[in-house]
């Protein structure tokens, strides 16, 4: 959904897509919660080891965040990212490992409540954000709307949050956590003003 919204330049189309996507997400979360606890095994993604795919995605994301830190000249971002990168490399290549089957996603009562909160409350905030962003961009006198990017990031954030609360694999949890961190950074700096960049 995030990609669809990113490429949706039409405000009227976005006003249909966002509420529809929020409705589907919220209803799916409630149905998931009503069905109760579950376990989901994911061994492969497109024929590749799921753990390897997530590790590569995590590595690429950390390199991207490191690049942001370099571009901004932020020692804090670069230092924190390097620590995470060292941890990932140590976990994957240095620690002696042995194959233990791990259920990729596990839902218990608490995680299902969290999915419902993220999807319903996050969805309502997203719908409210549509009107807010219209007024905000009018206030900033923007000629070209940044709303496609904004709503794409919001949906990516909500998806990563749901992945985070359902994930049963430490490596995968780090990836979802880093996605939420990057999305937060991008949302805080969304206006691209000096103040927004400093706050991000």
Name every feature range the model reports, one short phrase each.
Residues 10-14, 149-200:
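Alpha-helical multi-pass transmembrane bundles of energy-transducing inner-membrane proteins
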Residues 1-152:
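Transmembrane helix-loop-helix hairpins at membrane boundaries of multipass inner-membrane proteins
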